[in-house]
């Protein structure tokens, strides 16, 4: 289905990184893009740059999200907002569990619950869930993050069953290491994390993820691209080992 058959899009976690890149790409495609994130200043800068409609809303604010979805019939929804905390379940606190489950899984369930029935009724729509290779593979630490992303992986497959017989498509994007500041947010030191995980590595850019999503959305109506694993060429599939070459 070409982009011209869709009119509106919702992107969560839209103020930076992959979310901002997705907003930029969708705006270039002529969509009315609603960008949702907590940081009003960054959203306003994004709106000036792209023409998107900013919404300074916490993805976990169910009342605010509900009002927005009641006002706009979204044709495309990209569930991109996510958080991670370092450490395994052995040293996790109550907040570590609650925050990651609420943002990474519960908020996605609610947004899909609020938007997918309209897509089914219109016989048109596309849900894109940003998951992770952590949904499928195991590596050290981040136990709760793994569990929440595994939930998104299962949900993405189940939504295809729920929409059986309707032209509502579902795509799960499973990135590996991407050149964003997520590692800095997890470890609490963006500069140190960039030196450890980003600088000197050949990594996909946020725009590469946005291009992959655009490819899935622009596919013919009879084609549902269900899952994409997007890793650096030099990252070992299924792990965090990424080779640095001169």
Which role fits each region the language model picked out?
Residues 117, 161-164:
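Alpha-helical segment proximal to the catalytic Tyr-Lys
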Residues 112, 148:
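Active-site helix of classical SDR
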């Amino acid at each position: 289905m070409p982009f011209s058959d869709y009119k509106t899009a919702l992107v969560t976690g839209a103020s930076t990184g992959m979310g901002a890149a997705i907003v930029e790409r969708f705006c270039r495609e002529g969509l009315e893009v609603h960008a949702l994130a907590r940081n009003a200043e960054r959203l306003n800068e994004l709106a000036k740059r792209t023409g998107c409609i900013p919404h300074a809303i916490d993805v976990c604010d169910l009342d605010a999200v509900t009002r927005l979805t009641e006002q706009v019939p979204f044709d495309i929804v990209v569930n991109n907002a996510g958080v991670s905390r370092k450490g395994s379940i052995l040293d996790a606190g109550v907040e570590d569990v609650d925050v990651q489950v609420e943002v990474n899984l519960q908020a996605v369930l609610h947004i899909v619950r609020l938007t997918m029935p309209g897509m089914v009724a219109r016989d048109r729509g596309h849900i894109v869930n940003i998951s992770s290779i952590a949904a499928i593979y195991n590596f050290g630490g981040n136990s709760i993050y793994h569990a929440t992303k595994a939930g998104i992986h299962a949900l993405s497959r189940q939504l295809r069953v729920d929409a059986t017989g309707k032209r509502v498509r579902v795509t799960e994007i499973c990135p590996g290491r991407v050149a964003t500041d997520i590692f800095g947010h997890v470890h609490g030191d963006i500069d140190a994390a960039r030196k450890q995980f980003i600088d000197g590595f050949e990594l996909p850019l946020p725009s590469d993820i946005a291009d992959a999503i655009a490819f899935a959305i622009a596919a013919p109506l009879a084609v549902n691209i269900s899952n994409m694993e997007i890793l650096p060429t030099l990252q070992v599939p299924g792990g965090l080992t990424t080779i640095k070459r001169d």
